UniProtKB/Swiss-Prot annotation:
Component of the oligosaccharyltransferase (OST) complex. InterPro entries: Oligosaccaryltransferase, Ost4p_sf. Belongs to the OST4 family. The chain crosses the membrane at residues 5-27. The lineage of its organism: Eukaryota, Fungi, Dikarya, Ascomycota, Taphrinomycotina. It comes from Schizosaccharomyces pombe (strain 972 / ATCC 24843). GO terms for biological process: protein glycosylation. Subunit of the oligosaccharyl transferase (OST) complex that catalyzes the initial transfer of a defined glycan (Glc(3)Man(9)GlcNAc(2) in eukaryotes) from the lipid carrier dolichol-pyrophosphate to an asparagine residue within an Asn-X-Ser/Thr consensus motif in nascent polypeptide chains, the first step in protein N-glycosylation. N-glycosylation occurs cotranslationally and the complex associates with the Sec61 complex at the channel-forming translocon complex that mediates protein translocation across the endoplasmic reticulum (ER). All subunits are required for a maximal enzyme activity. This is Probable dolichyl-diphosphooligosaccharide--protein glycosyltransferase 4 kDa subunit. Pathway: Protein modification; protein glycosylation. Its main location: endoplasmic reticulum.
Length: 32
């Protein structure tokens, strides 16, 4: 596995986790 492939995997994983956290906070937020 090359460094570029590894970097792409890490970047994709980081973005996915960030989106999941944002979605979780949005859904868990009490509805006004």
């Amino acid at each position: 596995m090359t460094d570029v492939q590894l970097q792409n995997i890490v970047t994709t994983f980081g973005i996915s986790m960030m989106l999941l956290i944002i979605l979780y906070h949005y859904l868990s937020r009490p509805q006004a």
